[in-house]
A protein has these predicted regions:
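Short beta-strand->loop micro-motif that forms the acidic, two-metal-ion catalytic signature
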Residues: 43-47
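Catalytic core of pol beta-like nucleotidyltransferases
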Residues: 1-24, 33-35, 39, 49-106
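Glycine-rich beta-strand-to-loop/alpha-helix junction loops that act as flexible
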Residues: 29-31
Length: 106
C-alpha cells in the first residue's frame, strides 16, 4: 500500500507523462507498493505505453529523474508496450510477476 507522499509522486509522474504520451498502465511495485520501504528505497514504476521509441524512452527517464530529484527519490522505470508483453519480449521476468502480485495501479 502506498503512503500519501508516494501516491502523490506517482500521480505527478503519471500526469507529466500523460502530457507526452498515452499511458496504458502505470503501476508502482517493489518495497513502496508493499509498504516496507525505508528512506533509501527507490520507487519502482512499470509504465505501459502504446508505442515506444528511443526518444520517448529517454523522455520518460528524464521526467522520472526530474520528479525524483524534486522529491529526493530515485525513480526506476520499466517501460513496455502491450506487444512487448504479449510477445513475451520481457520473457518470464520475475519483475513481471512482482508487478502482477504486489503492484498498485495509479
Amino acid at each position: 500500500m502506498l503512503d500519501s507522499k508516494d501516491s502523490q509522486i506517482a500521480q505527478q509522474l503519471k500526469s507529466r507523462l500523460s502530457q507526452i504520451t498515452q499511458i496504458e498502465q502505470l503501476v508502482i511495485f517493489g518495497s513502496r507498493a508493499r509498504g516496507n520501504a525505508d528512506r533509501e528505497s527507490d520507487m519502482d514504476v512499470f509504465i505501459e505505453v502504446p508505442t515506444l521509441t528511443p526518444h520517448l524512452r529517454r523522455s520518460i527517464s528524464e521526467i522520472a529523474w526530474e520528479i525524483g530529484l524534486e522529491n529526493d527519490l530515485l525513480i526506476f522505470t520499466l517501460v513496455a508496450t502491450p506487444g512487448d508483453i504479449r510477445n513475451g519480449l520481457l520473457g518470464a521476468n520475475p519483475i513481471l510477476r512482482a508487478i502482477e502480485k504486489e503492484g498498485v495501479a495509479i
